[in-house]
A protein has these predicted regions:
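Short recognition patches in nucleic-acid-associated and regulatory proteins
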Residues: 20-37
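Cys/His-rich metal-chelating microdomains
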Residues: 18-21, 54
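Metallo-beta-lactamase
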Residues: 15
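Short hydrophobic-aromatic micro-motifs
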Residues: 49-50, 58
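Immediate flanking context of iron-sulfur cluster ligation sites
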Residues: 2-9, 34-48
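Short cysteine-rich clusters marking metal-coordination/redox-active sites
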Residues: 12, 51
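Short, Lys/Arg-enriched, disordered terminal segments
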Residues: 1-5, 88-91
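C-terminal structural segments of small proteins and small subunits
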Residues: 58, 63-91
Length: 91
């Protein structure tokens, strides 16, 4: 009998939609209070997930959704880096 592997699902903090964990980008507030983009998904700290969509990133920055989810001010450089990552995956 074959076992069906469970796919871990996570919710985008901006849209509220659920996606498989590997399809989302994780942004982490480290224990030191820094904000980093966790490409591997193993970084230590409080994480929030975003869908890989430029509109989602723009909305997160405009509404400060990541700031609220991570309980810290997210620098503009993080949003720029997120856009760059998404742009590389598209093109």
């Amino acid at each position: 009998m074959n076992k069906v592997k469970k796919v871990p699902m996570r919710k985008c903090v901006v849209t509220g939609e659920q996606f498989p964990k590997k399809e989302l980008i994780r942004v982490v507030r480290t224990p030191e209070g820094n904000v980093i983009i966790d490409q591997v998904g193993k970084a230590n700290g409080h994480g929030a997930y975003l869908s890989r969509n430029l509109k989602t990133i723009d909305m997160a920055q405009k509404k400060k959704t990541l700031d609220k989810a991570l309980e810290v001010e997210v620098p503009n450089e993080i949003y720029d880096e997120l856009r760059k990552i998404i742009g590389e995956n598209i093109g």
